Every structure is written in structure tokens, then in C-alpha cells.
Design a protein with these regions (language model features):
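Active-site catalytic motif of lipid deacylating hydrolases and related acyltransferases
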Residues: 1-37, 109-136, 141-153
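Serine-dependent carboxylesterase/thioesterase catalytic core
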Residues: 19-100, 104, 113
Length: 153
């Protein structure tokens, strides 16, 4: 596990710093451990970090380390919770042609950060809602599929 380094706060302009750190780490793992299947995850602002990493092939707005195409196959799955872009009708599954099919963009019912809901408690209750367990099962399936497809190619 790796905790992305960035100043998580209400200041969403810090997302670029997190995206730079995550991209740098992904690229490093892909280069030094090419057989490793990487799983990306994020919650709330961390989900926004994953949005940038997986959808921005060019630098901009403080994001200076875009993920090169060669690193994309090393990511087996992406799971995000409480993703702010989903509230705008743009979940990560739609935003990213490279990662969409490998992505679970999960939102609790009535979570106001990722839906039009108004229950702020639901934004902090992902473990209790069962979505974390569901995501873990989904990730396991995708990692196993990537191992199988890599072994057969």
C-alpha cells in the first residue's frame, strides 16, 4: 500500500499535487516491478486525484507528470468512493477510455459529494454501507483477470 502524498484539504487545487505523486509512484512501480498489478483507489478528494491520473494524458493546471501510455496496462483496477465528478454526471467510468472498464466509481445513496443527495453522514459511511467490501471483491476479480490475460499473452 502507498499513501499518496499531497495536502488533502477543502482546497481542491491540491489535487494536482496528489496526481503528480500518484503518477510518479505508478511509473516507478511499472518500471521496477513490471509484473506487479497495480490497484488505484481514492475517497472524496482522493477520488478526484485518481480522476486526474487516469484521465489526463497531458500536463496542465499543476499536473506535470501525466501517466504515459506504457504504464496503463500495469493498472489492474481502480476503485473510488464519493467521487465529486460523479455529482456532475461524469463518473470516472465515463471519463476514462483507458481505465473505464477497470473502474468502480462508487457512491452511497444520498451522498451529497457524488450525488444530488443531502445526507452528509452517508459520505463517511462507505465501510458500513457494504460498498468497500463490494469494491474489494470487484478488485480481486479484476486483478485475477489481469494475471490470466498477462500469462496468456
Amino acid at each position: 500500500a502507498y499513501a499518496v502524498k499531497y495536502p488533502a484539504s477543502w482546497d481542491f487545487s491540491q489535487v494536482a499535487a496528489g496526481a503528480n505523486d500518484a503518477s510518479k509512484r505508478i511509473q516507478s512501480i511499472a518500471a521496477t516491478c513490471p509484473e506487479t498489478k497495480i490497484v488505484l483507489g481514492g475517497y472524496s478528494q482522493g477520488a478526484a486525484v485518481m480522476d486526474v491520473v487516469t484521465t489526463s494524458p497531458i500536463a496542465g493546471l499543476g499536473y506535470t507528470k501525466p501517466l504515459p501510455a506504457a504504464a496503463v496496462p500495469h493498472v489492474a483496477a481502480v476503485a473510488v468512493f464519493g467521487n465529486p465528478s460523479a455529482r456532475l454526471g461524469r463518473p470516472l467510468t465515463l471519463l476514462s477510455p483507458d481505465f473505464g472498464a477497470r473502474t468502480a466509481d462508487l457512491c452511497n445513496t444520498n451522498d451529497p459529494i457524488c450525488s444530488s443527495g443531502d445526507d452528509f453522514d452517508s459520505h463517511s459511511s462507505y465501510p458500513e454501507s457494504g460498498l468497500v467490501k463490494l469494491a474489494a471483491q470487484w478488485i480481486t476479480k479484476h486483478v485475477q483477470q489481469r494475471k490470466t490475460s498477462t500469462a496468456n499473452s
